[in-house]
Amino acid sequence: LRNEEISMNARFSPSLMCMDLTRFREQIEAMNASASFYHVDIMDGSYVKNITLSPFFIENLRKITDVPIDVHLMVNHPEDIIPMCIDAGADIISFHPETANNKIFRLLTQIKEAGRRCGVVLNPATPADSIREYAHLLDKVTVMSVDPGFAGQKFIPETLNKIRQLIAMRETHGYHYLTEIDGSCNARTFKQIAASGVDVFIVGTSGLFNLDDDVAQAWQKMEQIFAQETAAA
């Protein structure tokens, strides 16, 4: 791809744990025309030592957007939360394979049978080929470029090779999943991430919300920064 094509084809998914929840409706309505997905992190305080958003949040988000709601479950028992997310209106539900080793096929099937899309999230140390037994079922594979649990961590560049491996696997075997990167996507990393060929960029505090108090302005600034960084390749 030429750089301008990368820039035009880039899909951005704002991480809503980083938004200003005191301005919930205002910020969502400002992003509705631009966001490809809304990334909703649900943590249980056990799998990761943090507690963030919830199915109740999804239910309220669903009332004010048609943008696909993409849920990332960082929980030890995804089977308990998946039905709640489906009922709340989630479009895509992803979990960490380590939390579901004896029931991965059951959970992926449950999500698909509810008419939703399914995915898995790979931690920085989880290899790409670990998904090969069920890759044909996946709609999305998210690569964590930081260890999961907290916003604002340092980018782990070794994870970019995993994106390339996932894209190569997709091309070789005819899989249909999107690739997505989660963690520290911002002005410092856009160039190297875009070069990996990833489909979706999850943007949070440093990549989007801290750029301007007005989120519509912040979005414009993010797109300008992204275009500049990827054009300099």
Residue ranges and their predicted role:
Residues 40-110:
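N-terminal active-site wall of soluble small-molecule enzyme domains
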Residues 23, 91-178:
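Conserved anion-binding
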Residues 24, 31, 41, 85, ...:
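Conserved, mostly hydrophobic/aromatic
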